[in-house]
Amino acid sequence: MIYSTTESIPGKEIEEIVGVVTGNVVQAKHIGRDIMAGLKSIVGGEIRGYTEMLTDARDIAIQRLVANAEEKGADAVVGIRFTTSAIMDGSSEIMVFGTAVKLKK
């Protein structure tokens, strides 16, 4: 499955727009990471535990987007965008969305 933030795939022609597809995940903070984050916020620097958590969450959201596109018979997803939001205290959602398309063979 090809997926891209661009509206087209170089060297490929879009034959049909299948529709909007999404993938999301809600990730909760880990108490150990939260303690380290509190310390890092005092001294500064990257909070690696959160970086890793968000990277994993983004990857899961992309996998779900691809699965959604495959269920609809798409060959690619174009124009993908990411959004984040706080769901409740201590958890965040990462959502990825885009347009599923069929490519000319």
From Swiss-Prot:
This is UPF0145 protein CPS_2458. Coiled coil: none annotated. The lineage of its organism: Bacteria, Pseudomonadati, Pseudomonadota, Gammaproteobacteria, Alteromonadales. Belongs to the UPF0145 family.
